[in-house]
Amino acid sequence: MKIKKFIGTVFLATAIVFTCACSKIDYTASTDNESLPLPSFTDDNSREESNVPPANITTELMKENYKIELKDYKLTKEAEEIVKEGTEIFTDVAPFTGEGYIRLGAFQSVDFLIELPTDQHYNITISACGNGGAVTLTTGGTKLIDSENGKYKRWNGNQHGAYKVHQSRLFTDYNVAPVYLEKGINKITLQTVSGSVYIDSITVTEANVKSDRYEKAGTSIAGDEINYGRLQTMSYLKSIYGKQTLTAQYVTPNTNAEIDVIYRNTGRYPAIRCGDLTYCTKAGASLLSGANENTDIELAKEWAKQGGMVMYSWYWYSPIGKTSLYAKDCEFDVTKAVTDNEKYYTLTEEELKLLLDDGSINEECFKIFCDMDSVASQLKILYNEDIPVLFKPMAVTDNETYWWETDEETYKTLWKMMQIRFEELHELSNLIWICPVTKGRMYPGDDYVDIIGCDIFNNSDNANLQGMLNTDALTLNTKMTALTECFFTPDPDILYRENCMWLWCGALDGKYLINSEGYMTGNYISVSQMKKIYNHELTIARDELSID
């Protein structure tokens, strides 16, 4: 059933497998094209796996009550006052406060010890300048550990984002989202992760984490044709937004390996099964061996029948030249493929072929539309089964990693081409469009997006509040926000404490959870933490969904 939308937005009237034996996982069907070693069993948590899931899940862990005592506070610490004797103090590059400032070279760090009066949230402002380097802020670090990429040593503790310091000879304030800190002495560490940075000072002030942003979001649906299941799903998502977080897990393509591991260890399934349509195009299919049939849509159908929600990303292999996702390896020029001529968006492949033959469009444009049709044909299977799909195509990175990120206008036009073609030619009115952008200039616009996504790869257990606030700002809080990709789901207690209730948290597949034998590694998340996540009152598992 479809509901025609007569105005620009629709306002919602009301506030969605393997067996237990482990089989060998084929990592040639992974969305990561690079060769990565599998994690070894170095964490005893990997041995905690239960052979038989609990028979009944009847109790839920109550959220931990973090003490918050609001109190006015402000303190500025000059960088030159806290460094070791003998550290060079600079005075000649930019106007500064205090007696001077310090320079942090590549991967160097400096610690600020701050005595705080109460347990509460605090804003931290970094006064910095430099030549385009980047600095991270960590709290509570006690020892040095390997960074995620293995290139340097960083402090453990809670990471609160990386901040690009613009090239300038003037100190600029960089504001960190509210951070929960306890009464007493707190260690705040700044460390460069690229280039060099000059640090003048940090300022710590009290903060009050507000929740009104949840109420503003999620009252409109993109597009003109709205499937009833899509409307129902959006209404449900709006009803839980800011109150609970949906569990979500990516799977190795054409398997349910990761979600089976979760069930074995928690007795529950994630609310959302997250797949990837990367192998549905001609170029993507060429990477599959004969033994690896592309059967993921059938698994998604079965998942939906069992009461789960379905999500699909699309990491798009280049349709011409060398098959790759990455701009640095790609011969395909997407700027030649996009067109502003909307009449082409809804033409069939046969009609487009005629235009290609007479020179009205080029091969790049034709191939783009063909790939869209290949993916649409798979999504149509789910449409025919009345299954709503959370659809997240064309992820955006900070460093323009993928070929579709060439420039903002090309990206936005490509998004528009896809959405209009899917909706009008293929009648895919069951898609909930998720735009995974972190840059405002890449955002296609509210008329083309239902939910905004944020991909954050951070190996410390914090809520990533800075990422949520930055993402919210792209749409002025008009769209619900999901943590669409992460190494693992953050602790629900910390999500609650930070008032950072992502709509869902999409934990990555493969080495981030299991090894090649299909067993949990414990390298990123322990069994005990996973049990907490899936049995917590602030999270929703598959058996707790109530969309109907």
Where are each of the predicted segments found?
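N-terminal module-boundary/linker segments of secreted carbohydrate-active enzymes
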Residues: P54-E60, T205-T278, A283-G290, D493, ...
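Extracytoplasmic
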Residues: D44, E49-R230
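Aromatic- and acid-rich polysaccharide-binding/catalytic face
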Residues: G275, K439-N462, L508-D509
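C-terminal motif of bacterial Sec signal peptides marking the signal peptidase cleavage site
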Residues: T19-A21
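Substrate-binding cleft of secreted/luminal carbohydrate-active enzymes
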Residues: K479-D548
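Substrate-binding cleft of extracellular glycoside hydrolase catalytic domains
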Residues: A283-T413, M417, L428
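Aromatic-lined carbohydrate-recognition surfaces of secreted/lumenal glycan-active proteins
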Residues: A248-Y250, K392-M394, D398, W415-G440, ...
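Bacterial lipoprotein signal-peptidase II cleavage site
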Residues: S23-A29
